[in-house]
């Protein structure tokens, strides 16, 4: 199988060649931990891509949110079009975890909405890891959560080959055993249907279907096909086999399930006896009723709501043993890349404690067995022990990464020649009037402004005041979802408005070359939002523009300000010296506007589609549904999940309205 093949029109420049060489050599020498300290806009992702090509290791990239993960996924997919680049994040569009509030005696049942396309991408990631070595998986912290055993997932897969003897009923049973459902009407992922001697399977992790044609009890022909058009894509040759992987990550052979059910019953008996001995009759009755219902559902259907809470029994783990996460699907020699490590590592650290705190009340009050504790994310120590080799990527790595790393590789020079922005300190008195003056000067030049405040109230008041002053301004806060955030940034770049006000959302991952001025209000208020690392990250937002500058409004120079200025000036001097030596004139980055995730509002899409449908015949409406399905699959393939979801809802509306 071919290895990683980097495809790019660009050659490494500035500090990139040296960073690539040092990191690659460090990995080849067996260094376990390294830091890539790369300034904003220095091309850290391109550097990492080159390192992956050099060392040829399966790679897991962890980002601290879905937005950054999607951005990295798109970039790596462009760099490695001939390799398996996968996306593994939480598949919930909406998630309300199960919880119990003792103070008000309120039980909150688990409620969730699963994004089917992201679920497919998760399954595709594990499939690629089992089948090949040239795999990059871009993930959020979902990668440390329990997803079941890779050995069972591999062992339960259905392998088919032309000429094999297999009865229809046996094949149906094998598919149902790995969570496929029979559906002779709709071509839904994770389903199969039968027409005479032809069985069509729609794998949960693929966009194509598998057509199995039987002659008696013998497989006569196997081919892949387009689920929308039904046309054959490719025929599986006689010597080759095709593997149909389970439709869910949690799977188990029947004999193992019987053993697991016995283990659950034994734990139930022990816990009920404990509750009764403590005279907690209500809790014991509640636990008995709930657990026995779950056991009956598992016996009859092979599944129950909340089955993951019994995963320790199904996996054969002992109490306290680490769960099987995505990391178990990687080979031992994998490479780990942690993006924005100063944020991502604390996030990984916090996952386990938060999960345990929520389950404590559920277990104490008889809603769950104690084994529910073991359906959990990895602790940080468990995660750390699973690391083979790691690169921590950040413009401001934390003391932890710096302390455990054998090498810190700096990437200070940007390929564009851009230098870190000039930073000015101005008094807090009259900071708003001064800010307005600077905004007007910057706006006249056709540039944009970012303003960061300390509190939500201050951001709202400032936005309102700037609007009264005739300034085109928007406010971005934490309640804004990912899609709307992307649209706000796009509108800022397009010049729909000139100033964006925020609190903590204007730091990592905000790439806006049009921004020439960053204002940090109340910069002298020591704390998380005005720490050395936060200040450096925020100031870095002006580093993609050749005319970029920063103003810190402060009544005094704090230790954080002093340290941030010292580091920024150090980097700036290195960059200026490099440019002078090589005759480089800094040029503002010219970055094309990305397509909008959703081109029209949802309501407009629905009314437009239904309005058109009113004038069509039944056959034309059916054709329209087929076209919309093809468009939905294309949108999902391009990671335009919100558009795909809108199209999916349009299709449902059409089917319901016209009884299709």
Swiss-Prot record:
Keywords: ATP-binding, Cytoplasm, DNA damage, DNA excision, DNA repair, Excision nuclease, Helicase, Hydrolase, Nucleotide-binding, SOS response. Signal peptide: none annotated. It holds the Pfam family Helicase_C. ATP binds at residues 38-45. GO terms for biological process: nucleotide-excision repair; SOS response. Residues 431-593 form the Helicase C-terminal domain. It is found in: Cytoplasm. Gene3D superfamilies: P-loop containing nucleotide triphosphate hydrolases, UVR domain. One of its GO terms (molecular function) is excinuclease ABC activity. Forms a heterotetramer with UvrA during the search for lesions. Interacts with UvrC in an incision complex. The UvrABC repair system catalyzes the recognition and processing of DNA lesions. A damage recognition complex composed of 2 UvrA and 2 UvrB subunits scans DNA for abnormalities. Upon binding of the UvrA(2)B(2) complex to a putative damaged site, the DNA wraps around one UvrB monomer. DNA wrap is dependent on ATP binding by UvrB and probably causes local melting of the DNA helix, facilitating insertion of UvrB beta-hairpin between the DNA strands. Then UvrB probes one DNA strand for the presence of a lesion. This is UvrABC system protein B. It comes from Methanococcoides burtonii (strain DSM 6242 / NBRC 107633 / OCM 468 / ACE-M). The lineage of its organism: Archaea, Methanobacteriati, Methanobacteriota, Stenosarchaea group, Methanomicrobia.
